[in-house]
Amino acid sequence: METFKVVETFVSINGEGKKAGRLAMFIRLKGCNLNCSYCDTTWANKRDARCELLTAPQIVERIKEAGVELVTLTGGEPLLDENVSELIGSILMMPKVEIEIETNGSVPIRYYKERDNRLTMTMDYKLPSSNMEENMCLENMEYLKPWDVVKFVIGSREDLNRAKEIIERFRLCEKAIVYFSPVFYQIQD
């Protein structure tokens, strides 16, 4: 049975996005393929970061014990794990549970194009201040659903202008929910 490198699990009130205010279990998987300038979880992406090796049934058991109906798979980048679809499938076997996948936008989501609204993608689009924009998987824009979220982390006026370009180019407001999130102490007048 496959195992997943889990650096932490915790229950908290979701603080951002479409599901803000809801109680959620966060499952943070180890590893990321990007190195964003403003990353707030670099510790979870280091090679020597401590983690538990958990199977999908063990993770499902933790979700059941927590008694929540919203699970947020985050990282790092949770879609890097080649077996994450097994974990997603196991979690969705729980009838009332919804999953929100926080993805950095660099990994293809086409494998999840056939899904209902119990599986939501919250996808970052990395802007110039992240130093990672060249890694964005633009084909992901084709696979967004109306219940998905595209999040732009804004660290400069250049970022704001670029976000506007991307929103217009891909007609994102017609495809998904769009959010801006500021990088604190970055934008100057």
Can you name each region flagged by the protein language model?
Residues 12-17:
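A short beta-strand-turn-helix
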Residues 4, 11, 23-24, 35-118:
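Conserved Radical SAM active-site core
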Residues 30-34:
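Cys/His-enriched microdomains
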